[in-house]
Amino acid sequence: MRVDNTASHQNVDEQEIAKFEAVASRWWDLEGEFKPLHRINPLRLDYILQRSGGIFDKKVLDVGCGGGILAESMAREGAQVTGLDMGYEPLQVARLHALETGTKLDYVQETVESHAQKHPQYYDVVTCMEMLEHVPDPASVIRACAQLVKPDGHVFFSTINRNTKSWLMAVVGAEYVLKMVPKGTHDAKKFIRPSELIGWVDQTPLRERHIIGLHYNPITDHFKLGRNVDVNYMVHTQRDEA
């Protein structure tokens, strides 16, 4: 395990790390706090596979991998996966689960900025899902992801839009009414409008290729992808060719 001790460590919110450390042991409980992540993971994975043209035998980095839900599923698709996170306990859980399931992948405790300094233009695909709204400087993360991916490579981001509807759905609804995630999981002030995210992307060699919303219907208890990006959304970007 490698631990980052560089100045880029400053782009870490210790309170956010502590929140996820406290519940890390239940990361792979399909009925626990991370049930929504397990439910949406097939949608995320299918989107990544379709937009990137497949990831078999490709080098893939999952930034903010947590306990490894997405990272492990990408490794099972035949990718050479590295999971990156600053939470010690989630990474321990991820390593143990990979060992139990016989899934081959690597986990590193390091900031994405530090990793980018060491591995520029190394990965074919970079994913950064449900992470940007948990760091002090999301633009710095986007710049690092752009640095990490090869020319013509793919970078995927997902986060939550910032508006009244997203606050009602992602905070009031998900945390307090439906109790899908623990109270305090999200800070609505840290949500990111698509225009902001794409603005940061445009300041890098990345170019936006596609954007799609992730929708939850509480009546049918069903998740699906769609064009509306009012709440959760994913963005597919691609680095300019050399």
Curated annotation (Swiss-Prot):
GO biological process terms on file: methylation
Alphabetical UniProt keywords: Methyltransferase, S-adenosyl-L-methionine, Transferase, Ubiquinone biosynthesis
Enzyme Commission number: 2.1.1.222, 2.1.1.64
Molecular functions per Gene Ontology: 2-polyprenyl-6-hydroxyphenol methylase activity; 3-demethylubiquinol 3-O-methyltransferase activity; polyprenyldihydroxybenzoate methyltransferase activity
HAMAP family: UbiG
UniProt family annotation: Belongs to the methyltransferase superfamily. UbiG/COQ3 family.
Domain of life of the organism encoding this protein: Bacteria
Pfam families registered for this protein in UniProt: Methyltransf_23
NCBIfam families: UbiG
Sites where the protein binds S-adenosyl-L-methionine: 44, 64, 85, 129
Transmembrane segments annotated in the record for this chain: none
Organism: Yersinia enterocolitica serotype O:8 / biotype 1B (strain NCTC 13174 / 8081)
Biological function: O-methyltransferase that catalyzes the 2 O-methylation steps in the ubiquinone biosynthetic pathway.
Name by which UniProt lists this protein: Ubiquinone biosynthesis O-methyltransferase
Pathway(s) where this gene product acts: Cofactor biosynthesis; ubiquinone biosynthesis
Catalytic reaction list: a 3-demethylubiquinol + S-adenosyl-L-methionine = a ubiquinol + S-adenosyl-L-homocysteine + H(+); a 3-(all-trans-polyprenyl)benzene-1,2-diol + S-adenosyl-L-methionine = a 2-methoxy-6-(all-trans-polyprenyl)phenol + S-adenosyl-L-homocysteine + H(+)
